[in-house]
């Protein structure tokens, strides 16, 4: 791919991303405004029910809720372009600051979980492919099937019951103990159970995918040729099969980033873990428009971005797709 075509390629990707985010923001804004509930309750609490009609009208004017929905959106979009995403009704501070205060916990839980899922699924998939049909393969298959069928909220409650209530060896809620915000060991202990749920809930699917892809590659004609040259099954798998499997695996893992982070939202709620998951639940419950809008926009933008990254990985790494692109470029040139 030549330099001008690369610029055009990434320019198209950037334009597609911006247009998708624009449409997403408009859709989320309209849906959040049309949802049932009273946002003044979030802002004023119990006092909202005691407001007179005149005071209610003044409050709606103050928050910009008296304007048409499209006018509200245009005003929100103009402010958002300058980095102003509005004030959280519940926390009485900028929505971006509220999210920033919680994002670290979610990124820690989701980031460590994603790295463990990526590493362990790759290792498990390779081991199961090498030992196809053995007791190890069957045991992993059965364990994965059972674990994958358990809902994350139920698995969370089960681990809390066993390790936090019965055995009392691990904390079952929060991100740290009172007064232990800077204690790394205490934070790590609070991370173990939620992290276990996140990893167990996603690990097996990707391990199965790696195993099946490797087994498909092992049946290809080039593997017979490699074995005829004296290469062992292990060498063929590592040098050839794994290399051909990685583009698909990397693109699927890129798409899965939002899915893994979305899984942490449920886990955070069950474990009362102070991250974006509990924040999203609170913003929806209290109809905190600005906070809910920014959370939804960030989540949607992450999904769109990861989809584009996955597509780019496939197009840039997979030699078959690169060859097709080269043929198309050659046909376009005079």
What positions do the PLM features span?
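Hydrophobic alpha-helical transmembrane segments of membrane transport/permease proteins
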Residues: 21-71, 167-187
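Hydrophobic alpha-helical membrane-insertion segments
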Residues: 21-27, 146-161, 253-258
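An internal, D/E-rich "acidic patch" concept
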Residues: 3, 65-122
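Alpha-helical transmembrane segments of integral membrane proteins
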Residues: 6-8, 103-136, 181-334
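Membrane-water interface segments at transmembrane-helix boundaries in multipass membrane proteins
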Residues: 142-204
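Charged, compositionally biased N-terminal leader segments and the immediate start
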Residues: 2-34
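Short hydrophobic, aromatic-rich alpha-helical segments embedded in or entering the lipid bilayer
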Residues: 51-82, 271-282
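Hydrophobic membrane-targeting alpha-helices
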Residues: 26, 30, 34, 127, ...
């Amino acid at each position: 791919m030549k330099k001008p075509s690369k610029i055009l390629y990434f320019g198209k990707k950037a334009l597609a991303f911006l247009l998708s985010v624009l449409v997403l923001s408009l859709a989320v804004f309209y849906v959040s405004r049309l949802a049932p509930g009273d946002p003044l309750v979030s802002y004023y609490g119990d006092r909202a029910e005691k407001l007179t009609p005149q005071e209610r009208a003044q409050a709606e004017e103050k928050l910009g809720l008296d304007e048409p929905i499209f006018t509200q959106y245009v005003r929100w979009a103009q402010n958002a372009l300058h980095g102003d995403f509005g004030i959280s009704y519940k926390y009485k501070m900028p929505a971006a600051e509220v999210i920033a205060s919680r994002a670290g916990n979610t990124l820690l839980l989701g980031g460590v979980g994603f790295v463990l899922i990526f590493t362990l699924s790759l290792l498990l998939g390779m081991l199961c492919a090498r030992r196809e049909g053995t007791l190890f393969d069957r045991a992993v298959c059965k364990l994965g099937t059972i674990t994958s069928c358990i809902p994350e909220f139920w698995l969370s409650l089960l681990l809390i019951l066993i390790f936090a209530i019965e055995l009392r060896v691990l904390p079952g809620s929060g991100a740290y103990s009172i007064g232990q915000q800077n204690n790394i060991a205490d934070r790590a202990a609070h991370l173990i159970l939620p992290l276990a749920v996140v990893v167990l809930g996603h690990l097996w699917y990707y391990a199965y995918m790696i195993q099946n892809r490797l087994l498909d590659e092992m049946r290809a004609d080039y593997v017979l040729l490699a074995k005829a040259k004296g290469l062992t099954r292990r060498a063929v798998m590592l040098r050839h099969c794994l290399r051909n499997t990685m583009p698909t695996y990397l693109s699927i893992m890129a798409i899965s980033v939002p899915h893994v982070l979305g899984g942490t939202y449920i886990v955070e709620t069950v474990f009362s873990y102070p991250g974006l998951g509990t924040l999203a639940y609170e913003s929806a419950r209290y109809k905190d428009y600005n906070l809910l809008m920014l959370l939804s926009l960030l989540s949607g933008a992450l999904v769109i971005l990861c989809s584009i990254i996955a597509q780019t990985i496939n197009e840039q790494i997979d030699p078959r797709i690169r060859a097709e692109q080269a043929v198309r470029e050659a046909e376009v040139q005079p």
